């Protein structure tokens, strides 16, 4: 039986919120909050993959296993691919990518992503989404939207408002029920993950700054389904960070 591992990619030089992995949340750095949250799962191992010696030192101080990676990776998935190669995971194993800026991610969703990949044998990656309930979120580029087919395979991901409802120009007129927000959690088959870093980086991946588009561009399938539990958006801005701090301080 395949082992299932969690890898948390943690880059220090975030563009929108510098050093956010080390941002204080109720007395602990965010990366520690994420790590402690995922330790509630029952997977075989949990690893932090980082390009920062500072993050490595801090993470090891609270007991995490850490792999130091190069600092020139195109995406978090590329970073995880390097870590997986260094760790020697078997090709049949599954790795779940939990973003280092999601300290409130429900454990049920992590387990769901892994199980979805096990169930969908044609897919090399699985991920989750949830219905958008606020029309403003459709137009927020920080909320990635996704459309998928009747068999629950992703067709496209975008920061734009997809699908486009032709004939409606006013936000109030849009049928919001057909819009889904992508939740940034991925499960990969290790064999594919090792191959991912060798794939062509597509123009659309660069244009949208969405690593999952490399998978679709190269003809592979991403399985997707609605999440078991609602997932708060990740911490991308100072405003996001303040919201999370308030939740931990309640």
UniProtKB/Swiss-Prot annotation:
Q: Which domain of life is it from?
A: Bacteria
Q: Which residues cross the membrane?
A: none
Concerning its family, UniProt says: Belongs to the KdsB family.
Keywords annotated in UniProt: Cytoplasm, Lipopolysaccharide biosynthesis, Nucleotidyltransferase, Transferase
Origin organism is Francisella tularensis subsp. tularensis (strain WY96-3418)
Function statement: Activates KDO (a required 8-carbon sugar) for incorporation into bacterial lipopolysaccharide in Gram-negative bacteria.
- EC annotation from Swiss-Prot or TrEMBL: 2.7.7.38
In the UniProt record, which is one GO cellular component term? Answer: cytosol
Offer one Pfam family short name for this entry.
CTP_transf_3
Extract the PANTHER family matched here. Answer: 3-DEOXY-MANNO-OCTULOSONATE CYTIDYLYLTRANSFERASE, 3-DEOXY-MANNO-OCTULOSONATE CYTIDYLYLTRANSFERASE, MITOCHONDRIAL
Task: State any single GO MF term.
Answer: 3-deoxy-manno-octulosonate cytidylyltransferase activity
Q: Which InterPro entries match?
A: Cytidylyl_trans (IPR003329), KdsB (IPR004528), Nucleotide-diphossugar_trans (IPR029044)
Localization (cell): Cytoplasm
Which NCBIfam families does the entry mention? Answer: kdsB, PRK05450.1-3, PRK05450.1-5, PRK13368.1
The protein here is known as 3-deoxy-manno-octulosonate cytidylyltransferase
Q: Which Gene3D superfamilies match?
A: Spore Coat Polysaccharide Biosynthesis Protein SpsA, Chain A
Q: Which GO terms describe its biological process?
A: CMP-keto-3-deoxy-D-manno-octulosonic acid biosynthetic process; lipopolysaccharide biosynthetic process
Which transformation does this protein catalyse, written as a reaction?
A: 3-deoxy-alpha-D-manno-oct-2-ulosonate + CTP = CMP-3-deoxy-beta-D-manno-octulosonate + diphosphate
Q: In which pathway does it act?
A: Nucleotide-sugar biosynthesis; CMP-3-deoxy-D-manno-octulosonate biosynthesis; CMP-3-deoxy-D-manno-octulosonate from 3-deoxy-D-manno-octulosonate and CTP: step 1/1; Bacterial outer membrane biogenesis; lipopolysaccharide biosynthesis
């Amino acid at each position: 039986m395949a082992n299932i591992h969690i890898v948390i990619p943690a880059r220090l030089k975030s563009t929108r919120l510098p050093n956010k992995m080390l941002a204080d949340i109720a007395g602990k750095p965010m990366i520690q909050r994420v790590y402690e949250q995922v330790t509630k799962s029952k997977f075989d191992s949990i690893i932090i993959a980082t390009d920062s010696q500072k993050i490595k030192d801090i993470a090891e101080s609270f007991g995490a296993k850490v792999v130091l990676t190069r600092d020139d990776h195109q995406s978090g998935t590329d970073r995880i691919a390097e870590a997986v190669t260094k760790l020697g995971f078997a090709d049949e194993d599954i790795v779940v990518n939990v973003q280092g800026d999601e300290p409130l991610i429900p454990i049920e969703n992590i387990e769901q992503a892994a199980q979805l990949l096990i169930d969908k044998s044609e897919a090399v990656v699985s991920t989750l989404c949830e219905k958008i309930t606020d029309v403003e979120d459709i137009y927020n580029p920080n909320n990635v939207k996704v459309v998928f087919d009747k068999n629950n395979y992703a067709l496209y991901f975008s920061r734009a408002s997809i699908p486009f409802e032709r004939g409606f120009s006013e936000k109030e007129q849009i049928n919001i029920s057909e819009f889904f927000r992508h939740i940034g959690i991925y499960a990969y088959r290790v064999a594919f993950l090792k191959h991912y870093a060798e794939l062509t980086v597509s123009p659309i991946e660069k244009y949208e700054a969405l690593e999952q588009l490399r998978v679709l561009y190269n003809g592979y399938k991403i399985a997707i389904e609605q999440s078991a539990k609602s997932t708060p958006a990740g911490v991308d801005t100072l405003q996001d960070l303040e919201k999370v701090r308030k939740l931990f301080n309640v």
